[in-house]
Amino acid sequence: KTKAALENLKNKDFVFLHVEASDEAGHDGDVDLKVKTIENLDARMIGPIYKEVKTWSEPVCIAILPDHFTPVELRIHVGEPVPFIIWYPGIVPDEVERYDEISCVTGGYGLLRLRQFMEVLMQY
Protein backbone atom coordinates (compact mmCIF):
# COMPACT_ATOMS: atom_id res chain seq x y z
CA LYS A 1 0.00 0.00 0.00
CA THR A 2 2.84 2.38 0.81
CA LYS A 3 4.54 1.85 -2.54
CA ALA A 4 1.24 2.17 -4.43
CA ALA A 5 0.37 5.39 -2.59
CA LEU A 6 3.74 6.94 -3.45
CA GLU A 7 3.48 5.88 -7.10
CA ASN A 8 -0.02 7.36 -7.41
CA LEU A 9 0.99 10.60 -5.69
CA LYS A 10 3.42 11.23 -8.54
CA ASN A 11 0.60 11.77 -11.03
CA LYS A 12 -2.64 12.17 -9.07
CA ASP A 13 -3.97 15.14 -7.10
CA PHE A 14 -5.48 13.01 -4.34
CA VAL A 15 -4.66 9.57 -2.94
CA PHE A 16 -6.74 7.91 -0.23
CA LEU A 17 -5.03 5.10 1.69
CA HIS A 18 -7.40 3.12 3.90
CA VAL A 19 -6.10 0.75 6.60
CA GLU A 20 -8.49 -1.21 8.81
CA ALA A 21 -6.18 -2.51 11.58
CA SER A 22 -6.71 0.11 14.30
CA ASP A 23 -10.48 0.03 13.78
CA GLU A 24 -10.51 -3.72 14.34
CA ALA A 25 -8.50 -3.28 17.55
CA GLY A 26 -11.14 -0.79 18.71
CA HIS A 27 -13.89 -3.32 18.01
CA ASP A 28 -11.92 -5.90 20.00
CA GLY A 29 -11.68 -3.48 22.95
CA ASP A 30 -7.90 -3.95 23.02
CA VAL A 31 -6.22 -0.62 23.78
CA ASP A 32 -2.70 -2.09 23.65
CA LEU A 33 -3.35 -3.58 20.21
CA LYS A 34 -4.86 -0.29 19.01
CA VAL A 35 -1.73 1.59 20.10
CA LYS A 36 0.50 -1.07 18.52
CA THR A 37 -1.38 -0.91 15.19
CA ILE A 38 -1.07 2.89 15.07
CA GLU A 39 2.66 2.66 15.86
CA ASN A 40 3.02 0.01 13.14
CA LEU A 41 1.19 2.23 10.63
CA ASP A 42 3.55 5.05 11.51
CA ALA A 43 6.65 2.89 11.06
CA ARG A 44 5.60 1.03 7.92
CA MET A 45 3.43 3.52 6.02
CA ILE A 46 3.17 7.05 7.36
CA GLY A 47 6.87 7.49 8.15
CA PRO A 48 8.13 6.22 4.79
CA ILE A 49 5.56 8.26 2.85
CA TYR A 50 6.41 11.41 4.82
CA LYS A 51 10.15 10.86 4.39
CA GLU A 52 9.77 10.40 0.63
CA VAL A 53 7.42 13.29 -0.16
CA LYS A 54 9.53 15.75 1.84
CA THR A 55 12.19 15.36 -0.88
CA TRP A 56 9.86 16.12 -3.80
CA SER A 57 9.93 19.50 -5.52
CA GLU A 58 6.12 19.54 -5.82
CA PRO A 59 4.60 19.95 -2.31
CA VAL A 60 2.34 17.19 -1.02
CA CYS A 61 -0.19 17.48 1.80
CA ILE A 62 -0.56 14.51 4.16
CA ALA A 63 -3.64 14.04 6.34
CA ILE A 64 -3.81 11.21 8.85
CA LEU A 65 -7.11 10.30 10.48
CA PRO A 66 -9.43 7.37 11.13
CA ASP A 67 -12.57 7.06 9.04
CA HIS A 68 -14.67 7.02 12.23
CA PHE A 69 -14.30 6.99 15.99
CA THR A 70 -14.22 3.48 17.54
CA PRO A 71 -13.54 3.82 21.29
CA VAL A 72 -12.12 0.65 22.86
CA GLU A 73 -14.46 1.14 25.84
CA LEU A 74 -17.56 0.96 23.62
CA ARG A 75 -16.23 -1.31 20.85
CA ILE A 76 -18.59 0.28 18.30
CA HIS A 77 -18.49 3.21 15.87
CA VAL A 78 -19.68 6.51 17.27
CA GLY A 79 -20.35 9.83 15.56
CA GLU A 80 -17.73 11.88 17.38
CA PRO A 81 -15.09 13.94 15.54
CA VAL A 82 -11.84 12.05 15.06
CA PRO A 83 -8.26 13.06 15.86
CA PHE A 84 -6.26 14.13 12.82
CA ILE A 85 -2.88 15.35 11.67
CA ILE A 86 -2.27 17.59 8.66
CA TRP A 87 1.26 18.05 7.36
CA TYR A 88 2.23 20.39 4.54
CA PRO A 89 5.49 22.26 3.94
CA GLY A 90 5.25 25.60 5.71
CA ILE A 91 2.55 24.69 8.25
CA VAL A 92 3.82 25.75 11.65
CA PRO A 93 3.42 22.80 14.05
CA ASP A 94 1.31 23.28 17.15
CA GLU A 95 2.27 22.02 20.61
CA VAL A 96 0.57 18.60 20.36
CA GLU A 97 3.08 15.77 20.76
CA ARG A 98 0.74 12.75 21.02
CA TYR A 99 -1.74 11.36 18.52
CA ASP A 100 -4.85 10.56 20.53
CA GLU A 101 -8.39 11.82 20.93
CA ILE A 102 -7.63 14.03 23.94
CA SER A 103 -4.33 15.55 22.79
CA CYS A 104 -5.45 16.37 19.25
CA VAL A 105 -8.42 18.40 20.52
CA THR A 106 -5.93 20.86 22.04
CA GLY A 107 -4.18 21.35 18.68
CA GLY A 108 -4.34 24.36 16.41
CA TYR A 109 -7.48 23.15 14.62
CA GLY A 110 -9.26 21.81 17.70
CA LEU A 111 -12.29 19.64 17.01
CA LEU A 112 -13.62 19.63 13.44
CA ARG A 113 -16.58 17.93 11.81
CA LEU A 114 -16.10 16.42 8.35
CA ARG A 115 -17.12 19.49 6.34
CA GLN A 116 -14.82 21.75 8.40
CA PHE A 117 -11.95 19.28 8.09
CA MET A 118 -12.32 19.09 4.30
CA GLU A 119 -12.39 22.90 4.05
CA VAL A 120 -9.09 23.05 5.95
CA LEU A 121 -7.56 20.21 3.94
CA MET A 122 -8.47 21.75 0.58
CA GLN A 123 -6.51 24.89 1.49
CA TYR A 124 -3.38 22.85 0.77
Residue spans for each PLM region:
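Feature captures the catalytic ectodomains and active-site-proximal regions of enzymes
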Residues: 1-124
